[in-house]
Amino acid sequence: MGYNDDFIRIFSENVTRTGTQQLLDWLGTTDFYTAPASTRFHGACESGLVMHSLNVYNVLMQRYFEDTDNRESFTICALLHDLCKANYYKSGFRNVKNDVTGQWEKVPTFHVQDQFPFGHGEKSVYLIERFLRLKPAEAVAIRWHMGGFDDSVRGGSFTISDAYNEYPLAVKLHLADLEATYLVEKGTSSVNRR
């Protein structure tokens, strides 16, 4: 069973709200199941995005899910937090100098081609809401899952602090995303980082 089969199975088993099938149908028209998760770092490989989404789900459920938490909410947030990356990356090549031979070599790479520049977390929320109605905690968690890496936070916004104080799911999703990215997926890039 591949990543896309696991994704569809987990999503279908845990998410029952109106629009679920329409969202899955739409995902099938995008590159979500084959896209990388980043240009050069974690999951910079074919199917890196769906792999990363499943890793975030597994970390979130294994480390942070409590009896009082909502399984459907956790599933939606983990599996769809990076929906903004569907149809976002393009593959290509770049030249890198070989340290041993001194020759320039063409190596595969990914680059960003953002067709809808709406932000990161907020873009994921927007895309999800085209199909599923999100609960406030879900929308906030997905919006702020990047933590300190979010552009508005780097620009000086303190709203993230209010979000994390009010919505534990937002903190849990951010921590699961960090762990999946930097620990679980370490070494998953097929792209030369130079």
Feature map (PLM): residue ranges:
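Non-catalytic interface/linker regions that flank or bridge core catalytic/transmembrane domains
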Residues: 1-35
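Short low-complexity stretches enriched in small and charged residues
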Residues: 12-13, 32-45, 130
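Divalent metal-dependent catalytic cores for phosphoryl transfer on phosphate-bearing substrates
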Residues: 39-43, 51, 62-192
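All-alpha helical catalytic cores of prenyl diphosphate-utilizing isoprenoid enzymes
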Residues: 22-29, 42-54
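Amphipathic alpha-helical segments within well-ordered protein domains
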Residues: 8, 12, 57, 61, ...
